[in-house]
Amino acid sequence: MRKAIIAGNWKMNKTVDEAVKVVEELKPLVKDATCDVVVCPTFVCLDAVKKATAGSNIKVAAQNMHFEESGAFTGEVAPGMLEAMGIEYVVLGHSERREYFNETDEAINKKVKAAFAHNITPIVCCGETLEQRESGVTNNFIACQIKVDIAGLTKEQAEKVVIAYEPIWAIGTGKTATKEQANETILAIRNVVVEMYGKEVADKVRIQYGGSVKPNTITEQMAMSDIDGALVGGASLKAEDFSGIVNY
């Protein structure tokens, strides 16, 4: 059985004080959670949030990182810096990074490998546009992403990857894929992992759904065969809302 993982991507929200306040409110609400609980604050909040989660069951993720160890990359953060802070996860290849910062699958693959080199678990995002969904090319498009994003890993690394399926048309729009659509696409993603690394590895890979996840939609999504969690956006900014999802 794969253990569910629910992560809250705060995006570019929350000052340090606000971030710590949310975590302090969240801790008692999710202390009995049966899934892995992860929060993804901005870089400036990582240290304070990491300290605030000490002794709790809440893990901390960065929202991005560079693939190089150090150097003249102004504004970037190296994987070793995150490792030194005790950061457990990193979100890579989010559609907003791909769209606004022109991130390529090749760069994402370098980041995935760098994350593993520094004992950080990557949460690798993939997903299609509405145009691609309506044209019937969703599975082909996502397969192309995944085949590059997680290429060249050992089987031990591959089985630890978390994949987040986020239909771009459902992010922040209030629209959400039906539980059947989400499960069908996630099953297709798992089959790509089977092709790449074999069934034994694919059966261990946790695949989340993301895209306007709310407390009132999570239960039916988590009941599906291949959905192993959620990457939550706006609904993770309030402790009460996020705990309602975590405690599905």
Swiss-Prot record:
Q: Where are the active-site residues found?
A: 94, 166
Q: Which residues form a coiled coil?
A: none
Pfam families in the record: TIM (PF00121)
Which InterPro entries does the record match to this protein? Aldolase_TIM, TIM_sf, TrioseP_Isoase_bac/euk, Triosephosphate_isomerase, Triosephosphate_isomerase_AS
Main location per UniProt?
A: cytoplasm
Origin, by domain of life? Bacteria
Broadest EC class? isomerase
Name the catalysed reactions.
D-glyceraldehyde 3-phosphate = dihydroxyacetone phosphate
Q: Where does substrate bind?
A: 9-11, 172, 212, 233-234
The GO cellular component terms are: cytosol
- Pathway where it operates: Carbohydrate biosynthesis; gluconeogenesis; Carbohydrate degradation; glycolysis; D-glyceraldehyde 3-phosphate from glycerone phosphate: step 1/1
Is Isomerase included in the keywords of this UniProt record? yes
Q: Which family does it belong to?
A: Belongs to the triosephosphate isomerase family.
Q: How does it assemble?
A: Homodimer.
What is this protein for, i.e. what is its function? Involved in the gluconeogenesis. Catalyzes stereospecifically the conversion of dihydroxyacetone phosphate (DHAP) to D-glyceraldehyde-3-phosphate (G3P).
* Protein name, as recorded: Triosephosphate isomerase
Specify the species. Clostridium botulinum (strain Eklund 17B / Type B)
For this protein's source organism, the top of the classification is: Bacteria, Bacillati, Bacillota, Clostridia, Eubacteriales
- Gene from which this protein is expressed: tpiA
